[in-house]
Amino acid sequence: MCIRDRYRRKLSAALSHLKPDITVSLLRREINFITSLKDGSKKIGELHVNRKNYRNFEKNESNFIKELFAKLWMKSLVRHLKKLDKFVVLSEEDRANWPELQNVKVISNPLPFQSGTFSDLNNKRITAAGRYTYQKGFDLLLEAWSKICNRHPDWELHIYGKGDKTTYEVLAGKWKLKNLFLENATPDMLCKYHESSIFVSSSRFEGFGMVIAEAMACGVPAVSFACPCGPKDIIRDGEDGLLVENGKTEELAEKINYLIENEQIRKEMGKKARINVQRFAEDVIMQQWIQLFNNLLNGTKQ
């Protein structure tokens, strides 16, 4: 018996024993059979990445076989998703990526904390956070920083994350970057947000972009690439932060310089950020889940 068959048998037995009203799947290997299990529960699928980067199968591949496999795999996935009672995605932007589906519901990730204090936005410090990987685009951020650090030599850029920093250390040396600190991940990011005056997200793509919301909850305005998917749902451009065309490092540098040089605007955006981001507060998001559960159990359309 293969691993998939064994998993199906055990999951089916567990659901038959538990008899849940609702089963929520994170759409791993059970996506191929979850809706066929006869345990009586409503089936919800929840996706924590966006469609364009789901398992990286829909990237533009030069290999014809890979392209064909990606299309066939996505066609099969959509067929299974249609059978779910509800399919939950993290952003309105990603909802639009699934035009074949009529059962899509947007429920964003909740903020993991409520900040009782806020940054005064006086420190000359810019912060970014995430794994040291291609996805997070720190190479693009360093390129932008090369256009900022000499213009504002009293400002610092601190990046916090896990992973191999070698690529970024090489770029920092190549571009002779000043006041750049490639930090390790820290368990106390809340403190780092409070020490910051600007938060930057340089990701090429995201599932949502929770670090943006976290920084905003601390009263820190964010500058972010308008990458798929999440930042455009979180940041209200020009009100509580600034969006930049994805991958455009010149524009990223311009927007960061703008907030550095306009203290009053920076502080006004910070105040609005900590208010606007409360739509992602835990109690708000949990109420959306409760409403979804109740509607499914009551047979209410939504």
Regions found by a protein language model. Give the residues of each.
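Nucleotide-activated donor-binding/catalytic signature segment of Leloir-type glycosyltransferases, i.e.
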Residues: Y168-T186
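Short hydrophobic beta-strand element within catalytic cores of glycosyltransferases
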Residues: P221-F225
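Carbohydrate-associated surface elements
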Residues: E93, P110
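Aromatic "clamp/platform" in nucleotide-sugar-dependent glycosyltransferases that forms part
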Residues: R204
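Short His-centered aromatic/hydrophobic patch
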Residues: S25-E30, L47
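Membrane-proximal helix-turn-helix segments that form the acceptor-binding/catalytic region
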Residues: S12-A13, R51, K66-F87
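A conserved mid-protein helix/loop that constitutes part of the nucleotide-sugar donor-binding site
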Residues: K124, A128-K147, E250
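Conserved acidic donor-binding segment of nucleotide-sugar-dependent glycosyltransferases
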Residues: R236-G238, L242-T249, N257-Q264, Q278
